């Protein structure tokens, strides 16, 4: 079996940061990191990369936490095809007014499900009591109200800030020749230029 996970250090706590291109402080609504994760699978040609990976027989998924977002799959066959798809969709976001508005309804339903989950509500309320101002208390998905303010420009700004190899970690586990798999990954990287550290404000 082979396993790969590609994670970016961008989670629900990263809702205030400095735009490296303008030097201005950027404040984003709660739930943007999770929203961005949902939208990454949709490609410009209408294809959903998650379905492409599943059609190859791969067990693929993605998730968002307080401090990172990750895209992953595991398989016994078709690893190279899966690697192509993973590195393609993570490096080629496609956001439009239409597909962002559509996603708000989908995530809104997901938020509603968690609102009805007593265990999750217990956790969120405990975090709210433990942390007065720290963004770790924020629900990863945000709220219906906060995600209503998300737009394509905001998603692209966050993508361009946080989805860069210098802020990401790619881990591969399995029967690989280290030099060979590293070469294959480097061939697929679009932008590998070094960047300065991201200035986050908490």
Regions found by a protein language model. Give the residues of each.
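His/Glu-rich zincin catalytic helix
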Residues: 1-48, 156-202
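Acidic/histidine-enriched segments that form metal/cofactor-coordinating
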Residues: 44-158, 179
């Amino acid at each position: 079996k082979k396993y790969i996970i590609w994670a970016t250090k961008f989670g629900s706590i990263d809702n205030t940061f400095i735009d490296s291109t303008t030097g201005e402080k950027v404040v984003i609504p709660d739930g943007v990191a999770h929203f961005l994760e949902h939208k990454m699978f949709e490609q410009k040609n209408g294809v959903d990369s998650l379905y492409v990976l599943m059609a190859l027989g791969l067990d693929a998924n993605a998730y968002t936490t307080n401090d990172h977002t990750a895209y992953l799959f595991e398989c016994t066959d078709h690893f190279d095809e899966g690697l192509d798809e993973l590195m393609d969709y993570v490096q080629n976001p496609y956001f439009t007014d239409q597909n962002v508005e559509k996603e708000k309804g989908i995530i809104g339903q997901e938020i509603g499900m968690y609102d009805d989950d007593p265990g999750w509500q217990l956790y969120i309320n405990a975090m709210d009591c433990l942390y007065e101002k720290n963004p770790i208390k924020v629900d990863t998905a945000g709220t219906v109200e906060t995600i209503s303010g998300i737009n394509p420009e905001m998603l692209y700004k966050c993508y361009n800030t946080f989805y860069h190899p210098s802020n990401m970690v790619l881990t591969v586990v399995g029967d690989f020749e280290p030099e060979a798999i590293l070469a294959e990954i480097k061939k697929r990287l679009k932008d590998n230029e070094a960047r300065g550290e991201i200035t986050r404000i908490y």
